[in-house]
Amino acid sequence: MVAKVYYEKAQSAKAEEALNWVIKSASEEGYRSLARLRLAGLMIDKGDFAQAKALLAEKVVAEFEPLVEDRLGDIDTLDKHSDTAKGHYLKSWRGLDAHAPYRKYVEAKLNAIGVDPTIDGTTSGVTSSSSKSTLESKDHQ
């Protein structure tokens, strides 16, 4: 929270300091993971892709893995590596719940590089209650 305030006031050095403190000091891995993601975002904004990748290479809680892939895709897109960006964005899209609003954002990034993740119908690990109920109703007809 403190880092966000600093960032919004254009005090990125203080925001970085606050996020680094969380990474080193927080007792909860989720907080450390979130701080790494946010700090990586600041590094991407600064154009320091090497530092951003180093932060994203650290272990994060499983729930944040699709967001790490999204950030890696952003780096590769900015670095003009659309083939590897595609792979990262697809991993992110497939890792997010089908109903997560952020998934549409990742899908837009994929569309921007010429990829439609819905073409093959792969939703890897995601279940849709509406498709399940449709299948069940067809079985009973």
Residue ranges of each PLM-predicted region?
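TPR/TPR-like (Sel1-like) alpha-helical repeat modules
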Residues: K24-S25, V60-A62, L78-P101, E107-N111
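Extracytoplasmic/luminal low-complexity segments enriched in Pro/Gly and acidic/polar residues
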Residues: V2, A98, Y102-Q141
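Alpha-helical adaptor scaffolds
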Residues: M1-L67, L72
